[in-house]
UniProtKB/Swiss-Prot annotation:
Source species: Acidovorax ebreus (strain TPSY) (Diaphorobacter sp. (strain TPSY))
InterPro entries, A to Z: 4pyrrol_synth_GluAld_NH2Trfase (IPR004639), Aminotrans_3 (IPR005814), PyrdxlP-dep_Trfase (IPR015424), PyrdxlP-dep_Trfase_major (IPR015421), PyrdxlP-dep_Trfase_small (IPR015422)
UniProt-listed SUPFAM superfamilies: PLP-dependent transferases
Cofactors: pyridoxal 5'-phosphate
Protein known as: Glutamate-1-semialdehyde 2,1-aminomutase
Catalysed reaction equations from the record: (S)-4-amino-5-oxopentanoate = 5-aminolevulinate
Residue numbers of N6-(pyridoxal phosphate)lysine PTMs: 274
Pathway stated in the Swiss-Prot or TrEMBL entry: Porphyrin-containing compound metabolism; protoporphyrin-IX biosynthesis; 5-aminolevulinate from L-glutamyl-tRNA(Glu): step 2/2
Keywords linked to the UniProt accession: Cytoplasm, Isomerase, Porphyrin biosynthesis, Pyridoxal phosphate
Pfam families from the UniProt entry: Aminotran_3 (PF00202)
CC per GO annotation: cytoplasm
Taxon lineage: Bacteria, Pseudomonadati, Pseudomonadota, Betaproteobacteria, Burkholderiales
SUBUNIT field: Homodimer.
UniProt xrefs under NCBIfam families: hemL, PRK00062.1
Length: 434
């Protein structure tokens, strides 16, 4: 069913009168690309439908969690069964234990795990744990990496390595971020100098192994290796934020890929979210037993949550993880994702539009640039106006990618070869108009 008038617009007007910006997470407002956000009414498989009844091939996947696609039968069955048993108990359940066992089976660096309700909560708790375990205050993060909206992580770089960061949000006191040092991603020399200047005071280094809020930028193997070496040398903890990459790029997360290139590699703390909840509010952080036993009720680092380990969310996550652990899942997912980027690259090339892209598992990114950027300043060279035109052309053609230049995209197991072909066909027409 389609409509002659846009039903998304009056919904957006209603929302703006009640909700700041009309949305409950800023990127959904289409401020970066312009226009009216689509109000989604339902989703199934690889598709979403908006208030007008227009169908979209979905490459957002709820910003990553929907690795099986929307409405997978096994997940629906698990969620329905759990909901009938009770929405929330505020007490331990066997399913929490089963989910922890499933995660730890595939991510062996996580000897113990704590379930929470959001990636922000997991990242915030990981930082507190690192500080409590090391009895140090300073943290190192990287320009362009996003770890949730916790105060100490909403930081931009200072004027040099001797200075600490400045808050990127109103409401965050400078005193909160004064212990956060922001460096350029993939810059080994900066990282070494930072440890030379501040090593004894650094509690942790936190990084995304693939920076999905720079669209798609990988940590180089030398950079990751040196981060691990410097943390070990100075007694700091290496925190790998796999909220986006965990179970999305490989069954063992991105860290399993680095372990293939760096013998013995493992982080001290891992942060997970998105896929482990299968679309429900669920995240986790975990690490070595020695570090995790610093958490209450065993240790002095306090962390708690009313809905942590929610029985319906854990049922959803557990069903999802069991499906993606089946043989051949990631081979098929990775091939489909690669086919998408190769097809888009061919369409751009035929139109003479600069294009480069990268994929890992079911995660992808692309830039309207001749070569892949390695850090945030290089990402900023992308032509934003051209991207906005591309975005709206794809959207009008029934292809839904992230409404922001710097966001990664996601392919699910529900996407078919025909979906990829249809997407490339729409893109081919749009690229010709750029």
């Amino acid at each position: 069913m389609t409509h002659n008038t846009d039903l998304n617009l009056p919904l957006f007007e209603r929302a703006k009168a009640l909700i700041p910006g009309g949305v409950n997470s800023p990127v959904r407002a289409f401020r970066a690309v312009g226009g009216t956000p689509r109000f989604i009414t339902r989703a199934q498989g690889a598709y979403m439908w908006d208030a007008n009844g227009q169908r979209f091939i979905d490459y957002i996947g709820s910003w990553g969690p929907m690795i099986l696609g929307h409405g997978h039968p096994a997940v629906l069955e698990a969620v329905q069964k759990a909901a009938l048993e009770g929405f929330s108990f505020g007490a331990p359940t066997e399913r929490e234990v089963e989910l922890a066992e499933e995660i730890i089976r595939h991510v062996p660096s996580m000897e113990m795990i704590r379930l929470v309700s959001s990636g922000t909560e997991a990242g915030m708790s990981a930082i507190r744990l690192a500080r409590g375990a090391t009895r140090r205050n300073k943290i190192i993060k990287f320009n362009g990496c996003y770890h949730g909206h916790a105060d100490s992580l909403l930081v931009k770089a200072g004027s040099g390595l001797a200075t600490f960061g400045h808050a990127t949000s109103a409401g965050v006191p400078q005193e909160v971020v004064q212990h956060t040092l922001v460096l350029e991603y993939n810059d080994v020399a900066q990282l070494e100098e930072a440890f030379t200047l501040h090593g004894p005071d650094v509690a942790c280094v936190i990084m995304e192994p693939i920076a999905g809020n720079m669209n798609f930028v990988r940590a180089s193997v030398p950079f990751m290796r040196r981060a691990r070496e410097l943390c070990t040398q100075h007694g700091a903890l290496l925190v790998i934020d796999e909220v986006m990459t965990g179970f999305r790029v490989a069954l063992g997360g991105a860290q399993s890929l680095y372990a293939q290139a760096i013998p013995g590699f493992k982080p001290d703390i891992t942060v997970l979210g998105k896929v482990i909840g299968g679309g429900m509010p669920l995240a986790a952080f975990g690490g070595s037993r020695a570090v995790m036993e610093q958490l209450a009720p065993l240790g002095p680092v306090y962390q708690a949550g009313t809905l942590s380990g929610n029985p319906v969310a854990t049922a959803c996550g557990l069903a999802t993880l069991r499906e993606i652990a089946k043989p051949g899942f990631y081979d098929a997912l990775g091939a489909r994702t690669r086919a998408l980027i190769d097809g888009l690259a061919g369409a751009a090339s035929a139109a003479g539009v600069p294009f480069c892209g990268d994929t890992q598992g079911g995660m992808f990114g692309f830039f309207l640039l001749p070569q892949l950027p390695q850090n945030y300043p290089e990402v900023l060279n992308t032509d934003g106006m051209r991207f906005n035109t591309l975005f709206h052309g794809l959207l009008d053609g029934g292809v839904y990618i992230a409404p922001a230049l710097y966001e990664a995209g996601f392919v699910s197991a529900a996407h078919t070869e025909q979906d990829i072909a249809d997407t490339v066909a729409v893109a081919r027409d749009v690229f010709q108009k750029l």
